Curated annotation (Swiss-Prot):
One of the essential components for the initiation of protein synthesis. Protects formylmethionyl-tRNA from spontaneous hydrolysis and promotes its binding to the 30S ribosomal subunits. Also involved in the hydrolysis of GTP during the formation of the 70S ribosomal complex. GO terms for cellular component: cytosol. It comes from Treponema denticola (strain ATCC 35405 / DSM 14222 / CIP 103919 / JCM 8153 / KCTC 15104). Residues 520-522 are annotated as: G5. This is Translation initiation factor IF-2. Belongs to the TRAFAC class translation factor GTPase superfamily. Classic translation factor GTPase family. IF-2 subfamily. Residues 375-544 form the tr-type G domain. The keyword Cytoplasm applies.
Amino acid sequence: MDIENTNKPDVILNKKSSKAADSKPESGKTDSKRKVVVKVSKTSAGKSKKPESSSEESSGGKASGKQVISVKKASSQSSKPAEASVKEKKPDERLEETKKTAPRFEDKKSDAPSAQNEKRSFDSAKKEEKQTERKKPTPSSIDSIDFASKRPNVKAGNLADSGRRNNRGQGNRPQRPGGQGQGQPGQGRRRESNFSGAQARAYSDGKKQGFRTGQGGQQGRPGDRPQNRPGFGGPRPGAAPAPIPVEKNKAQTNKKAHKAKKEIYNKKNKEEEFFEERLLNQKKKQKEKIHNIPKQIEIMESISVSELAKKMNLKASELIGKLMGMGMMVTMNQSIDADTATILASEYDCDVKIVSLYDETVIESKEDDLSELQPRPPVVTIMGHVDHGKTKTLDAIRSSNVIAGEFGGITQHIGAYTVNTHGGKITFLDTPGHEAFTMMRARGAEITDIVVLVVAADDGVMPQTIEAINHARDAKVPIIVAVNKVDKPEANVDKVKTRLSELGLMPEEWGGDTMFVEISALKKLGLDNLLDTILLQAEVLELKANYTCNAEGKVIESRIDHGRGVVATIIVQRGTLRTGDPYVAGIYSGRVRAIFNDRGEKIDEATPSMPVEILGLEGMPNAGDPFQVTDSERIARQISDKRQELKRFEDSRNVKKVTLDNLYETIHDGEILELKVIIKGDVQGSVEALKQSLEKLSTPEIRLNVIHASAGAINDSDVMLAAADSNALIIGFNVRPTPQAKLLADQEKVDIRKYTVIYKAVEEIQLAMEGMLSPDIKEQVIGMVEVRNTFKVPKIGKIAGCYVLEGVVKRNCAVHVIRDGIVVHSGKLSSLKRFKDDAKEVAAGFECGIGIEDFNDIQVDDQLEIIEMIQVARKLSDSEKYKAPEIKEEGTETDE
């Protein structure tokens, strides 16, 4: 029977009772099995059919013990061929009908069906009817069933399908922990609708059987298992059917939808409130930041926009907007100068203080506890004019011969020594007295406690003596005057005291506060008195330092030592320096690899006021740079990187900018000569002194440009730099070129000059610069001629017959025509003849004929002065010292 292609499908659901239900009666009586066949015939509206009884067995109807129940259902006229609407009876009517036709189930333990069993069957049937009534499908859900659809993964008899009713047979399924038997039970009643694909296939065979391979049982009876296989467990009801979706009321749906919308709106409101609260907090923070702008900030000559905003507690975008209003397009990482930063800060009522490189990256140190302070040795600096006996005095104190190691007998390095006296240790710093070492003397005065001013009794006060006094006063340190060379016959101590008193150094015996000591370094006179005076002054100063904190000090000198690398001479001012300490010296960082004292002995630690040499620097610091130990090497490297970055920015600002105005000035003034120099020295202090001395030689016509200056030997890179930069001159001060550099210099024809005394280097460079200058042209009178007669020659003009009074007359020389003591014409000789022949020159006492260019008014008795133009070498001192023009910065306006 084709279900899909008929309008009146007859659905027959058959179930076979299981063998477990066919138990023998105990009384020996036999009951015939009864089978209930339910036929549902669907007719159109208004028509009816009589109930028909049919038997599937070979024996006929009533003889086989069957009961036939006919149920008539009407279908609506509007039903489609593939759809059936089922009109269910009321629960009470169905219950009565079930009571009439319900069979009595057999009990295994009883021979005949008892009233109690019958009552149980009625009760179970009633429960099934109630469940069916509760879960009956609506017409809309029945109409939507597609009988042709097949589910590929659903086997026949799968009771997990949705919409399956609970009025089915009970199979004897095994009771195992893994599941309820090996298969689903058969179906006792026919299904009205909601067939799955597997159920439709099981019914389409036209047999009354379950959806598995077992035979269907009667209504309410369990069916047989497939192929008469017994179950492993007792009888057990089938699995509960899946619930049929019940149509919800619109009111309930609307309530739930309203509740869901309300929850969504509540979430949105909460999110909006959260973001509004967050925005308010941000605005409050911004207002707080605006109110927390400091009254004063410290910056360097340049600062990035982000760093300035951080110092002012502002956003970088706000400052960028201000700069855009000023016509400057910058980014947050771009640097601006101090003037621009000052203008920006003034808009927020904030003052700007410009600090140095090291103040910007200062390492904060802890304050000293007075209980931890201990006495330290004094640091004494010996200063004075050159050749006044400073180093000789120190040699006499140290009982050594230091000056013999200096070239030219003058000190060109700052030396630091520790001397043990009967009153304790004293640290001496010996500074150069030559005028080229001004910076060295200034640094010596900064790191000292007492200044010993050495003045020669025979020379008196000299320019460097006055300079040393000024350095000591700037450093605010006391001065002890040591009058040296008092053993000389021409020594005049009173003259020295008088001159120094005029400069503000009044002797104690004259009522002042300056101590004077007369000494003789050559004969070692008065040295003990000098040491006692130093110790007395140190006792008055009460010099103390902390020995337990991180070491701090100053770099006195630095150099590159072959085999040891960068060597820095430092003096410890506070704390204790130990091997392995990470530190920062200037813009470079490092770790102390070794410590040496002033005698070259390796030591483990250095205490305050002790001068030492240390190894382990990454680069060579400048003399006078601060030295400080950090807590870790990482901190030292961070500070070093920051200082190097700021140093590079400062150097880039110092580069001269080529502007259109500068170009016009250069064209107008003519080409300026330039001598390029590379300076290499043994120590950084000497290199600095030589560089400053050479740069002072520049004039308006020639300029000396130091393109590179550093300590160390002359290497290949120096030669290549000189060759690439217009054959610059290399000056080596107390250093020599390496063999490779010397060979490369010969190939590239680079001039290398080596010096051991600084003033010799300055003199030779001055001569080289003078040789580059164009010579001066001067007039020199070489002869005097008297005009005794004149002749007119056609096409030539007037010729003067002359007599040479003195000197000589040369062809093409200049001539001045003097008449009555007045120069009436200045010109050039056009012709010179001796009789009729041309002559190159005519000596005194001879006659000659002279013609003058463009001049025919020559007369008798005129005097002719013969002039020769000669070249005279120029001196740098003849011209005004060069003053570098001010560089106009971009963005500045000039008054017109």
